[in-house]
Regions:
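Interfacial loop-to-helix junctions that mark the boundaries of transmembrane helices
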Residues: 14-19, 38-41, 64-75, 188-198, ...
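Long, contiguous bundles of hydrophobic transmembrane helices that form the permeation core
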Residues: 203-280
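Membrane-embedded alpha-helical segments and adjacent helix-loop junctions characteristic
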Residues: 62-153, 291-292, 297-359
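Membrane-interface alpha-helices at helix entry/exit sites of multi-pass transporters
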Residues: 108-116, 146-159, 186-197, 359-368, ...
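Hydrophobic alpha-helical transmembrane segments in multi-pass integral membrane proteins
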Residues: 62-63, 175, 242-252, 298-316, ...
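Hydrophobic mid-bilayer segments of alpha-helices in multi-pass membrane transport proteins
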Residues: 19-30, 39-60, 72-84, 136, ...
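Alpha-helical transmembrane segments and, especially, the helix-loop junctions at the ends
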Residues: 125-135, 152-186, 206-211, 339-352, ...
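Juxtamembrane and boundary regions of transmembrane helices in multi-pass small-molecule transporters
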Residues: 150, 189-232, 372-379, 383-432
Length: 432
């Protein structure tokens, strides 16, 4: 039985109805500005004042806001370390080497290039986060497709779909994962073990859909790339990433926050890059994307105000009890719908407190919904919006009708298969 809603606080400046209205209006404003980015402003320019306003008006108490900041602090630190790690890997030439490998092994065949893009995007998303795939791999895929004369659309679209779908595997793959990881109470290795089968199953469905949907583009002629000297393999970056992954497992096993492993990996690459003058302290700060980190924190506070002022009660009636297959499917479906309505980051912030009491299975079902669901619409995730800007910067076209039609084919199938795989994993491995 769910706890009853707490009585209205006495420290409110606004009555409950006005507090709810203000919180919802500010959330809509924050999300709209994050999508549109008026005047090129960072997302934090609107989100931070909005968070301050919900506190100042009493829509959310200062103590509750402080508690939310303390809860999100380690997650934000983890995210910063992973962003720096991904950028430094790019500085080391990891993504250029990946592009050379894709072009060489594709041998002028677009269908084979699609396989290579799926492999590269799946691994990069899982290990270095979806941001690395969107920001760093997408331009490389454009260049690789041009080099062999292939139509870029199937391969570039794969980057955005896999930045969402392939982010299911590890806690570091996506900010939503970090939040779910914290709420689930699972260790790093158990989280990965439970999500491995859903990750692989969803990617497999995506690949089959892409082969059929883009058949005409994939059958178009291409040519083998000219023989050129491949760039040197960035062994130091590869070894550092490998050691960081091992660090995630070891720190989780001994009860230490895995963020320390991410920090160690980022520091190792940063020190090397600074010594070799390949980066600067200012560039490292930019790589951490401080305005985006501030946006995440502010968004969490605004979302908490919305939840505390009535959304939790409204959604509570829609959350199914139990973690059977039907309940997991319902949770994932609800999460996917909510992600496309209000974006996946606020969706996971809203749903995690409501589903965490049901156990890790419910939390992971929500994660599947908020990660795969955004492939249906542009606004489902910030990564998709960023990908669209990158495509336009490379003179590519993204047609809303085509993007949505692809999502209609891919999302329901991959979502259902991933949830079924999660249910099997929970049955075999257990969620405790």
């Amino acid at each position: 039985m769910r706890a009853a809603c707490p009585p209205p606080r006495k420290d409110r400046i606004l009555n409950p109805q006005l507090a709810e209205t203000l919180s919802v209006a500010l959330l809509v404003l924050v999300l709209a500005c994050a999508v549109i980015r008026p005047f090129g402003w960072p997302e934090a320019v609107v989100a931070v004042p909005a968070a301050a306003l919900v506190i100042a008006t009493g829509a959310l108490s200062f103590d509750d806001a402080l508690a939310e900041a303390e809860r999100l602090g380690p997650v934000i630190g983890f995210l910063a370390a992973v962003l720096v790690l991904a950028q430094l890997c790019d500085d080391e030439g990891l993504f250029q080497a990946c592009g050379a490998w894709m072009g060489r092994t594709a041998a002028g065949r677009p269908r084979r290039l699609l396989v290579q893009v799926f492999l590269a995007a799946s691994v990069i998303t899982a290990v270095l986060s979806l941001d690395a795939t969107v920001v760093l791999l997408t331009p490389v895929v454009f260049a690789t497709a041009a080099r062999i004369g292939a139509r870029p659309k199937p391969h570039v679209y794969a980057c955005t779909h896999l930045s969402n779908t392939a982010s299911l595997l590890l806690p570091v793959s996506n900010l939503t994962n970090l939040l779910a990881f914290t709420a689930s109470g699972l260790s790093f290795t158990r989280f990965a073990a439970l999500m491995a089968l859903p990750w692989a199953a969803a990617i497999g469905v995506e690949y089959l859909v892409f082969r059929r949907f883009f058949a005409t583009d994939l059958d178009a002629g291409a040519q083998a790339p000219a023989s050129v000297e491949p760039p040197p393999l960035p062994l130091f970056a590869l070894v550092t990433v490998g050691c960081t992954l091992v660090g995630f497992v070891l720190t989780s096993a001994v009860g230490i926050d895995p963020a320390w492993a991410a920090l160690a990996g980022a520091l190792a690459l940063a020190v090397r890059a600074l010594i070799r003058r390949r980066t600067t302290p200012l560039a490292l700060v930019r790589a951490a994307s401080v305005p985006f980190l501030a946006f995440v924190l502010a968004l969490g506070i605004v979302v908490l105000a919305v939840v505390d002022n009535g959304l939790d009660d409204a959604l509570g009636h829609l959350i199914p009890e139990g973690t059977g297959l039907a309940e997991l499917l319902a949770l994932a479906g609800l999460a996917a719908v909510l992600a496309n309505v209000i974006n996946n980051l606020p969706a996971v912030l809203v749903l995690l407190p409501l589903t965490a009491p049901s156990g890790p299975g419910a939390v992971l079902a929500v994660l599947i919904g908020v990660n795969i669901g955004p492939n249906l619409t542009y606004a489902g995730s910030l990564a998709t919006l960023l990908w669209r800007r990158i495509v336009h910067a490379h003179d590519g076209e993204v047609e809303l009708k085509e993007f949505t039609r692809l999502g209609v084919y891919a999302v329901p199938a991959s979502l259902a298969v991933a949830v079924l795989a999660l249910w099997l994993s929970l049955t075999v491995i257990g969620g405790g």
